[in-house]
Amino acid sequence: MNIHFIGIGGISMSALAEICINKGYQVSGSDSNESYLLDKLRDQGATIYIGQKKDNISDDVNMVVYTAAVHPDNEELVAAKEKNKLVMNRATFLGQIMREYKNSIAVSGTHGKTSTTSMLSTIFEYADLDPTILVGGNLSMIGGNVKIGNSNHFITEACEYVDSFLNFNPKISIVLNVEEDHLDYFSGIDEIKASFNKFGKLLPPEGYFIINGDDENIDDILYDVKATIIKYGRDSDNDAVIKDIHFDNSGHGIFRIEYEGRDLGEFELSVYGLHNIYNASSAIMAALVSGIDLETIRKNIKIYKGVGRRFETKGYYKNALVVDDYAHHPTELKATLAAAKKLKKSTLWCIFQPHTYTRTKSLLGEFSEAFYAADKVIITDIYAAREKDPGDIHSKDLVEKLYQNNVDAIYIKEFEDIVKYLRENVKDNDLVITAGAGPIYKVADLLVEK
């Protein structure tokens, strides 16, 4: 079997390609830019093309897998269809792979997927269960974004964008939260809730639907779900109640869980913030229903120390801590900055790169209220990702909204100018956070360069 991946350099596509190589398939693929992920695939025997051309679809290719970002008029996709190749989108292909595993776990939600998938993977890996893992970030424990296991356990992120996760075949599904996002595809929150409801209905009756019971939209996704529903959260009506929350001197969470009247004891985390207590609680419940004993879960959850671009320490400038975070939704920004505030630094700087024009425009009001915990805010240009500039939204619009809300915010276009400004103004004991799903991390890297 010869499989070609259009957009093979993506975090999920590269992971699927690696799984196929491990299964003994011939793998080729194309992407627009070089990356370390492509180098890794080359080392494993994949044929990689830079640039997407119809000639890349050779006669011996049997199947072509493509991402949601690939346009219908893509040269390779058109050529594959003209040559009558088997064509499958990424999510459908991943769903087919999931069928091969007895215990497949899908982690979904508007935000927190990568952190929670990584937490859950850490619990399973250190329990010697040898899971196959697909994660949307760089998890040091597995040396990247994918690990090929030799067991019936499969752990993956599940994204709602373009209803991708409706192609999956999970036995356990987690929903961390349900909020407005991806409004270039969904018409609004009602359509998003309907999608998550369909996701829940994918589960078999013997499966588990583990959901954040404190989320205001969660009850609207439960209609006709056949699996066992486990709600977790701080509200006493939940099945798994999070209690006695506090933080150590480093800002790491400590909490207890009471499940169906039984005290599961105290859990200690090695990551920051209330949001990670919620993430961890879902991972704990998924591990518990998978048959992992409580003490193993308790020990292993503390081992997890984060994943790349999730409150990742990049180093220091002078004596100021420099951190990078993937936060690109208002709720994520609030959670990240709230966790940062607990570290009690002198001045909290946030350098934010908005991600996509659609998200920035549709959530402009929410973004304008997401930075209150920050003392100084720098906004740079919107990262387009898959979109074209519609001309009706600009980062300066966000800066103006922040100014109206009495947030100390400025706009700086170029990364180099941001770094120069920071070097001139950051003081000892400050905390600098770069935030966004685009390449804003480069500002942090440049700032800490010697």
From Swiss-Prot:
Pfam families hit by this protein: Mur_ligase, Mur_ligase_C, Mur_ligase_M
Keyword Signal applies: no
Annotated Gene Ontology cellular component terms: cytoplasm
Gene Ontology annotations of biological process type: cell division; cell wall organization; peptidoglycan biosynthetic process; regulation of cell shape
Intracellular or extracellular location(s): Cytoplasm
E.C. numbers: 6.3.2.8
Cited function: Cell wall formation.
GO molecular function list: ATP binding; UDP-N-acetylmuramate-L-alanine ligase activity
Residues annotated for ATP binding in this entry: G109, T110, H111, G112, K113, T114, S115
Catalytic reactions on record: UDP-N-acetyl-alpha-D-muramate + L-alanine + ATP = UDP-N-acetyl-alpha-D-muramoyl-L-alanine + ADP + phosphate + H(+)
Gene3D superfamilies: Mur ligase, C-terminal domain (3.90.190.20), Mur-like, catalytic domain (3.40.1190.10), NAD(P)-binding Rossmann-like Domain (3.40.50.720)
Name by which UniProt lists this protein: UDP-N-acetylmuramate--L-alanine ligase
Family statement: Belongs to the MurCDEF family.
